[in-house]
């Protein structure tokens, strides 16, 4: 059994802490995926639908949660009940019967009252007594309350219940009472959902409504305030969550409070109106969601479908190794998908071109390597049958020559094969061609003392009075390789006695031009384009066979094109139309487009 040492325990604790830290750094999108499942996010169409519908749900939820319709409706109902209560209280006060034999009115006390002060008698003050006669008030209260669904209760000066509109019946009225169910009511899922929905949208805590036991109105704060002459309103909620709005209005006669009129809405009246308003919002939400889904599907068809076609085409390109697969063309869209389509088409074309180039290069390499190998094989097979020392010496020289030729070919092929990768990895930097050309010409002049001695001139064409910039972005070694190849190529074709090579640097708009011109025999018209082909050689008779691989000009053009430039060849013709030499022109994009 493996026992944990303190070191292993501490290491495991550190690992657990690091794992805990990684768990705490979970991306929010990962959390959403865990909640809703990966299926929601497995397709761009489903993502568009999910986020668009989610945005609509959040919007409607915010509207329902922050909607002020309910509060406005409650305020309007309070004002309506207060106005209605003032009218009913005035009618009740006018209908109250006063027994003048048992009332003593002190005029001086009336004159001592201030504005707004009530003459409600104190418990030990029996100077003023205005009793309300329920029998005379009941018909008036019933007629005023009947057109509305408002409940009215009348309390006397001691907050005792005198009348309740629930128990006021007119003559001939048929009474109907709902009996309680035989079995207790069970809450359905619909009722539970509605209750939870209302609780979420009505988070404010309201006092619970209770019936006054024994008609004692003192449990209602608004009734007690009304006994002091101040009207008030209170909003309560029943056990079922239904709203009840109550207002208390003092019943006054001769500025004396005779009692209190308490008006209350029926439980659920306001909730029904709010529910209807929310139902209308939900209908609009349903229509908006349906429209959102349709628009999301249309949006998905314009985004996901083209992307799906591009993806399928890319897979066909990967699998179709022998045939050229066509990438769908969405360039007419003129948007990001159109740009992606153009990029994929160009990338695919470049890929196929590269495949063709590799196949062609492999075929050329195979062909070029077979020639020296065939010669080498023949020499090796013939060497044992050679009878004279002279024949053996000549065959040995052929073998050495073919080996050197193979070595040169393999080196040039290796250089050409890794050229693209090297240019892709290396970072281009600003390079002054004027400085580079001067250095290359100086080196070539020094080489002339060891090889064929020819005159090499360098000319930088600048505008009068201006300092022309010859700066380009590139790789100095590779651009130097182009110019060196052109100079050495020209050296091989000019005569040693009168040979001359001119390197000229100039600027044309946003291009830097390097020209290498010689006074040799020129180029055959049919060979001007072929000289840039791989392994093509057309060397002067003075050079031995196999001294050149034929890759120099091909590599030079490849380097120029990798820098966004070009390399071309032409003949120099004098005024008589006679070819007087060859000219190679290297064009590179300038790093700056202005002159300073």
Swiss-Prot record:
Which residues in this protein are found as Phosphohistidine?
Answer: 367
Would I find Calcium among this entry's keywords? no
Span list, region Disordered: 1-22
Enzyme nomenclature, EC number? 2.7.13.3
Give the keywords, sorted: ATP-binding, Cell inner membrane, Cell membrane, Kinase, Membrane, Nucleotide-binding, Phosphoprotein, Transferase, Transmembrane, Transmembrane helix, Two-component regulatory system
Pfam families attached here? HAMP, HATPase_c, HisKA, Sensor_TM1, Stimulus_sens_1
Q: Which residues cross the membrane?
A: 48-68, 284-304
Task performed by this protein: Member of a two-component regulatory system ChvG/ChvI. Activates ChvI by phosphorylation (Potential).
Instruction: Provide the protein name.
Output: Sensor protein ChvG
């Amino acid at each position: 059994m493996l026992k944990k040492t303190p070191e292993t325990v501490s290491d495991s604790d550190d690992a657990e802490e690091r794992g805990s830290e990684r768990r705490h750094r979970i991306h929010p999108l990962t959390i959403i995926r865990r909640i809703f499942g990966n299926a929601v996010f497995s397709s761009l169409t489903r993502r568009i639908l999910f986020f668009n519908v989610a945005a609509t749900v959040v919007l409607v939820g915010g509207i329902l949660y922050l909607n002020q319709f309910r509060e406005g409706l409650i305020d309007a109902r309070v004002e309506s009940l207060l106005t209605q209560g003032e009218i009913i209280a005035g009618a009740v006060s006018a209908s109250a019967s006063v027994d003048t034999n048992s009332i003593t009115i002190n005029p001086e006390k009336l004159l001592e009252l201030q504005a707004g002060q009530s003459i409600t008698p104190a418990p030990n003050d029996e100077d003023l007594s205005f009793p309300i006669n329920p029998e005379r008030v009941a018909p008036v209260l019933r007629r005023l309350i009947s057109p509305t669904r408002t409940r009215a209760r009348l309390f006397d000066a001691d907050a005792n219940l005198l009348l309740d509109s629930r128990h006021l019946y007119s003559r001939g009225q048929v009474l109907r009472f709902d009996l309680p169910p035989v079995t207790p009511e069970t809450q359905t899922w619909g009722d539970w959902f509605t209750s939870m929905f209302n609780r979420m949208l009505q988070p404010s805590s309201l006092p619970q409504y209770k019936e006054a036991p024994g008609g004692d109105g003192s449990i209602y704060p608004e009734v007690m305030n009304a006994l002091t002459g101040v009207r008030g309103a209170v909003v309560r909620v029943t056990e079922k969550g239904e709203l009840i709005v109550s207002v208390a209005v003092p019943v006054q006669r001769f500025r004396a409070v005779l009692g209190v009129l308490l008006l209350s809405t029926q439980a659920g009246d306001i909730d029904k109106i709010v529910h209807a308003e929310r139902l209308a919002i939900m209908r609009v939400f349903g229509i908006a969601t349906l429209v959102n889904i349709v628009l999301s599907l249309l949006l998905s068809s314009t985004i996901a479908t083209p992307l799906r076609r591009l993806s399928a085409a890319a897979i066909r390109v990967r699998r179709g190794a022998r045939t050229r697969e066509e990438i769908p063309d969405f360039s007419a869209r003129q948007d990001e998908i159109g740009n992606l389509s153009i990029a994929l088409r160009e990338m695919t074309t470049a890929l196929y071109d590269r495949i063709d180039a590799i196949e062609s290069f492999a075929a050329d390499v195979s062909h070029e390597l077979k020639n020296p190998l065939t010669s080498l094989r023949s020499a090796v097979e013939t060497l044992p049958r050679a009878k004279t020392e002279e024949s053996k010496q000549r065959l040995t020289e052929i073998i050495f020559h073919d080996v050197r030729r193979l070595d040169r070919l393999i080196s040039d092929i290796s250089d050409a094969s890794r050229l693209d990768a090297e240019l892709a990895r290396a970072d281009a930097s600003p390079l002054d061609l004027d400085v580079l050309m001067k250095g290359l010409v100086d080196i070539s002049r020094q080489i002339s003392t060891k090889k064929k001695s020819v005159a090499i001139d360098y000319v930088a064409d600048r505008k009068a009075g201006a300092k022309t910039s010859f700066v380009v972005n590139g790789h100095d070694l590779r651009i130097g390789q182009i110019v060196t190849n052109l100079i050495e190529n020209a050296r091989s074709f000019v005569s040693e006695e009168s040979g001359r090579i001119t390197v000229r640097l100039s600027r044309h708009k946003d291009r830097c031009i390097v020209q290498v011109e010689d006074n040799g025999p020129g180029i055959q018209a049919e060979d001007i384009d072929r000289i840039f082909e791989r392994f093509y050689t057309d060397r002067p008779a003075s050079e031995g066979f196999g001294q050149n691989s034929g890759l120099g000009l091909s590599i030079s053009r490849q380097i120029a094109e990798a820098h966004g430039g070009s390399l071309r060849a032409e003949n120099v013709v004098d005024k008589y139309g006679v070819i007087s030499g060859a000219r190679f022109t290297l064009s590179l994009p300038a790093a700056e487009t202005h002159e300073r």
